[in-house]
Amino acid sequence: MNRIQQTFQTSSAPFWYAQLELGFCYENSRTIMSHRKHYGPVRVQKMLWPEKTGVCHAIIVHPPAGIAGGDHLTFQIETEGQAHAVITTPGAGKWYRTNGKQAFQHIYLNVKDDSILEWMPQETMLFDGALAHSETDIHLEQTASFIGWDMLVLGRQARAENFVQGSYHNQFKLWRKNKLLVADTLYFEGGDRWLSSCLGMNNQAVMASFWAVPPEKFRSSFYLEQHIELIRELIMRMDVPVTLTLLEDVLCARFLGNDVRRCHDAFAAIRAKLRRYWFDLDEEFPRIWKT
């Protein structure tokens, strides 16, 4: 029997504490949401099944549309055997200018054997004056597969805003069976020389990372080297500032530039190729991206 729980509480505190737990399993030839629990202003807006294979597309929404000083936002998501979930957001996330308090986001993803999770939130904007702390922990079992990304935009580009005050701290860890495969840590403060240095952001406003872990049968160097060369050819044709590397059997792409739409298009194209190579699936972009 499916277990779906929902809770909602409000608080008079001048900050938000919000948490969303989601669980996905495979039942009756499609992926379903078997567990849902939320606290505060974060929830699933919609679930769709646009693919013939029964992949579940879920849209998660945080009604305040951003994280302010003192806020804590937590996501806990799990996929079970044979489930395939695609998770995205309806629009850009935001780290707002702070009131002097730190803001936090925690993301915990648990991908069990034979399941697939695609974690594809839209970009996050870092407002000048934000104090942002973000942590992402991804745990894969041996035969689990994962595709995900993180896109950060410094300042509000429409206002030509730069990040001159505040700080940003991001920690990303990807594990498989308690073995650490990837560990990324980034910290900078507003106005840091690193933001303008050619060894850092080089005066660019958009920085993004893409990670992908294939099914077990495609983890040999024979397959991975073929696939990464095909993706390099794609990136060259698109003429976008993306670099590709392999960290053991994790494919990693990095974007550094000024146009977040070009970043999104590049990562979406890489994701589409990997879906075809690894899962024999069409690209099937989330419909919310077209609105």
From Swiss-Prot:
Broad class of the protein's primary localization: cytoplasm
Transferase among keywords: no
InterPro entries registered for this protein in UniProt: UreD
Signal sequence extent: none
Tree of life domain: Bacteria
Key words, A-Z: Chaperone, Cytoplasm, Nickel insertion
Pfam families to which the protein is assigned, alphabetical: UreD
Ribonucleoprotein recorded as keyword: no
GO MF term list: nickel cation binding
GO cellular component: cytoplasm
Record localization: Cytoplasm
Family: Belongs to the UreD family.
Subunit record text: UreD, UreF and UreG form a complex that acts as a GTP-hydrolysis-dependent molecular chaperone, activating the urease apoprotein by helping to assemble the nickel containing metallocenter of UreC. The UreE protein probably delivers the nickel.
Job description of the protein: Required for maturation of urease via the functional incorporation of the urease nickel metallocenter.
HAMAP family with a match to the protein in the record: UreD
Protein name (Swiss-Prot/TrEMBL): Urease accessory protein UreD
